[in-house]
Amino acid sequence: MGVQSVESEASAMNLIPNAPGLSPNYWCTWSTQNFGREDEHPDYHNYLGGVGSQFARAEMNEKNLRRWLQQFPKIRGDLYLMLDDGWDVPYGVHPDKSRDRFGTLELDEERFPSFTGTPAQRLKKLNDFVKESGWRGLGLWVPAQAAGPIEKGPAMEAYWTERLLWCKEAGVEYWKVDWGTYAHDVEYRLFLTQLASKLYPQLIVEHAYCMIAYNGSQ
């Protein structure tokens, strides 16, 4: 076999598998919420910290989701589409003044008007829509807290039991647990993981640890 023949055969190889993989992987919307907007802010400070987060949350809606779903046509069957921060709160709600509004796990009706019904039904309709668009399924950003003045104990367990059962009914298979009142509370994160394992073992619970940049000298 000549060199030209080998090169031709190699260039024709397709290394992307035909069937979706079993290992969990996702594409997260957060960077696109920040940098995929149609408007442009020349001042980079508009992309940082709380200000940047406010702009990013404003981009979380059904119109943009329908556009995001068209990405990665060759590989999205392997990927969950991870809805990041902003999907379960109304427009204009931010943690600097309304932290206790986050964590409802109820798809905001103004942001996603086409997906109606009970909280579980809304999530299922959205998850089905994501799958019909060629993705592996829907993933959800979840804060390390409950919405409202709910303390640890039976009330907290009842709160998350209800939401885990919503996701089970909806077929949502991935949570990314991020910032929140209990972001740095290992016991709280363990509680969520163990409760999910008990009630909905098919759910993958990822824990994102929130911290400032680390440069190796501190």
Predicted regions, residues:
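Carbohydrate-recognition beta-sandwich/jelly-roll modules
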Residues: 1-80, 85
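Aromatic- and carboxylate-enriched substrate-binding clefts and catalytic-loop regions
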Residues: 75-218
